[in-house]
């Protein structure tokens, strides 16, 4: 099986990153925003893996492990905060939360 060309991996990473960014800017639900950030982090990890594979360096894999750790921490904290926000305000819509604050 032939390896995926470097340019194709970067294009895929770019498309995933842009999709995550667009979803982050358009959607106002806190859970969807967290998922969008996860997509963006995975796209960055894919770019690191592709670059490390292209130049034969293990640094891309190390950075991907760092990104996975960061993403797991972000999800844990984000979902915990989201749960508290939902319990207090009964909504996860970021715009409605901004209106409530004044």
UniProtKB/Swiss-Prot annotation:
Membrane topology listed for this record: Multi-pass membrane protein
Top EC group: translocase
UniProt-recorded Gene Ontology molecular function terms: NADH:ubiquinone reductase (non-electrogenic) activity; quinone binding
Reactions catalysed: a quinone + NADH + 5 H(+)(in) = a quinol + NAD(+) + 4 H(+)(out)
Species, as recorded: Methylococcus capsulatus (strain ATCC 33009 / NCIMB 11132 / Bath)
Name of the protein in its database record: NADH-quinone oxidoreductase subunit K
Alphabetical UniProt keywords: Cell inner membrane, Cell membrane, Membrane, NAD, Quinone, Translocase, Transmembrane, Transmembrane helix, Transport, Ubiquinone
UniProt function note: NDH-1 shuttles electrons from NADH, via FMN and iron-sulfur (Fe-S) centers, to quinones in the respiratory chain. The immediate electron acceptor for the enzyme in this species is believed to be ubiquinone. Couples the redox reaction to proton translocation (for every two electrons transferred, four hydrogen ions are translocated across the cytoplasmic membrane), and thus conserves the redox energy in a proton gradient.
EC numbers: 7.1.1.-
Keyword Cell membrane: yes
Transmembrane helix found in the keyword field: yes
Segments passing through the bilayer: 6-26, 30-50, 62-82
């Amino acid at each position: 099986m032939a390896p995926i060309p470097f340019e194709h991996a970067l294009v895929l990473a770019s498309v995933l990153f842009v999709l995550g960014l667009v979803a982050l800017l358009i959607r106002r639900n806190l859970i969807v925003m967290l998922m969008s950030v996860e997509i963006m982090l995975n796209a960055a990890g894919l770019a690191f893996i592709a670059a490390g594979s292209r130049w034969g360096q293990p640094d891309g894999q190390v950075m991907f492990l760092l990104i996975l750790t960061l993403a797991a921490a972000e999800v844990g904290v984000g979902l915990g905060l989201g749960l508290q926000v939902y319990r207090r305000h009964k909504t996860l819509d970021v715009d409605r939360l901004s209106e409530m604050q004044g």
